[in-house]
Amino acid sequence: MDPKKIARINELAKKKKTVGLTGPEKVEQAKLREEYIEGYRRSVRHHIEGIKLVDEEGNDVTPEKLRQVQREKGLHGRSLDDPKS
């Protein structure tokens, strides 16, 4: 997210605590917060999708649901053509 938008979120939060927000400012704050949260969720999802879990013996123990997502995206050498990957 653009640093200017994050600064604006913080500015509106501070103003809300001190003098309160106008109607249009409340709408702006809600939109900015939603945009921030969506970006955060995308980032976390991307990070989690890139994880491969292995046990002490080096065996892949990644949950099947995550493996399927990784197959669809071609991550960690997984392929839709090879269901065992």
Swiss-Prot record:
SUPFAM superfamilies from the entry? YnzC-like (SSF158221)
Which Pfam family name is an example for this entry? DUF896
Q: Where is this region: Disordered?
A: 62-85
- Could you tell me the superkingdom of the organism this chain comes from? Bacteria
Q: Which UniProt keywords apply?
A: Cytoplasm
Give the record's GO CC terms. Answer: cytoplasm
Compartment(s) where it occurs, according to its Swiss-Prot or TrEMBL record: Cytoplasm
Which InterPro entries does this entry report, sorted A to Z?
A: DUF896
Homology family? Belongs to the UPF0291 family.
NCBIfam families xref list: PRK02539.1
> Sorted alphabetically, which PANTHER family does this protein's record hold?
UPF0291 PROTEIN CBO2609/CLC_2481 (PTHR37300), UPF0291 PROTEIN YNZC (PTHR37300:SF1)
Protein name from the UniProt record: UPF0291 protein SPy_1687/M5005_Spy1383
Q: What species was this sequence derived from? A: Streptococcus pyogenes serotype M1
